């Protein structure tokens, strides 16, 4: 059965190390679209952090979709209509916020509107995230967060501090939440039902596609869930070694237009 849905991660996959979309990748995406293939961005970023990429790839028109917040939100890329939205509760927020204080690491919560932190001394990686995803930062005390629609929370800090903190997180948190380390300085907390994999399942069903018609392309541990559910998992040459063990195909690196290579070799052929 031919591949009709291709989910593509952004950082380390779609983009080069200097954060560009190569001409070759752009052309391959257009070729796939012309053959009726749904090319879908699947990212941990919020929608504000991918709008410019959707525009560059011409994936912001009728019939296009985007997976954001690692699967916490699936939207129509043209209208913004929400197909899937899974939120953390206020109790989830409090529990995770107070854990971060106990562990001595910075924390922020993300909604569709912005990045919220209770850290009076705002962490540099919160500022980094704000710049990366083009979202404002708001300082709010925990008491002021009661009515916020939180899609994910992030512990953010220096890699050595974060690694030490991770070792002290009680097992209860791993049982209750989906927890992924998306970069050496980001640890993301989401509802247990949230993953890029579940988002792809929802989207494939909406589009009337069988999972045998799906492909995912990624490079990092937060791509594992989507690589495990699709029939055609593709890992970048620059991907994590453990991830390559579950790949059906290994494509070229992100700096060598690996997404274009994968689309042309295994989707359009």
UniProtKB/Swiss-Prot annotation:
What is the protein named? Putative phosphatase M6_Spy0533
Similarity remark: Belongs to the HAD-like hydrolase superfamily. Cof family.
InterPro entries documented for this protein: Cof, HAD-like_sf, HAD-SF_hydro_IIB, HAD_sf
- The answer, when asked if Magnesium is one of the entry's keywords, is yes
Task: Cite the entry's keywords alphabetically.
Answer: Hydrolase, Magnesium, Metal-binding
**NCBIfam families to which the protein is assigned, alphabetical:** Cof-subfamily (TIGR00099), HAD-SF-IIB (TIGR01484), PRK10513.1 (NF007806)
Q: What is the lineage of its organism?
A: Bacteria, Bacillati, Bacillota, Bacilli, Lactobacillales
Q: In which domain of life is the source organism classified?
A: Bacteria
- In this chain, Mg(2+) is annotated as bound at 9, 11, 219
Recorded GO MF terms: magnesium ion binding; phosphatase activity
Gene Ontology CC terms, in alphabetical order: cytosol
- A Pfam family annotated for this chain is Hydrolase_3
* Active site, renumbered: 9 (nucleophile)
Name the enzyme's class: hydrolase
Q: Does the keyword Mitochondrion apply?
A: no
Co-factor requirement: Mg(2+)
Question: What Enzyme Commission number(s) does the record list for this chain?
Answer: 3.1.3.-
- Positions contributing to phosphate binding: 10, 43-44, 196, 222
């Amino acid at each position: 059965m031919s591949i009709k849905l291709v989910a593509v991660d952004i950082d380390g996959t779609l983009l080069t190390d200097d954060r560009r979309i190569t001409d070759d990748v752009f052309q391959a995406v257009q070729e796939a679209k012309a053959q009726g293939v749904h090319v879908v961005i699947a990212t941990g970023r919020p929608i504000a952090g991918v709008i410019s990429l959707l525009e560059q790839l011409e994936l912001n028109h009728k019939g296009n979709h985007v997976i954001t917040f690692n699967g916490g939100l699936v939207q129509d890329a043209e209208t913004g209509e929400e197909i899937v939205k899974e939120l953390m509760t206020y109790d989830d927020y409090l529990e995770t916020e107070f854990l971060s204080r106990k562990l001595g690491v910075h924390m922020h919560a993300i909604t569709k509107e912005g990045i919220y932190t209770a850290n009076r001394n705002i962490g540099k990686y919160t500022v980094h995230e704000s710049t990366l995803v083009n979202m404002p930062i708001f300082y709010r005390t925990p008491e002021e967060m009661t009515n916020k629609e939180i899609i994910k929370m992030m512990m953010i800090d220096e890699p050595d501090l974060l690694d030490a903190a991770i070792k002290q997180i009680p097992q209860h948190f791993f049982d209750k939440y989906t927890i992924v380390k998306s970069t050496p300085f980001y640890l993301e907390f989401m509802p247990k039902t949230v993953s890029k994999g579940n988002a792809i399942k929802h989207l494939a069903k909406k589009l009337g596609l069988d999972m045998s018609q799906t492909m995912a392309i990624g490079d990092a541990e937060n791509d594992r869930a989507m690589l495990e559910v699709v029939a055609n998992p593709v890992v970048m040459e620059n991907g994590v070694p453990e991830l390559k063990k579950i790949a059906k195909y290994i494509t070229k690196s992100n700096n060598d237009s690996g997404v274009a290579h994968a689309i042309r070799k295994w989707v359009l052929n």
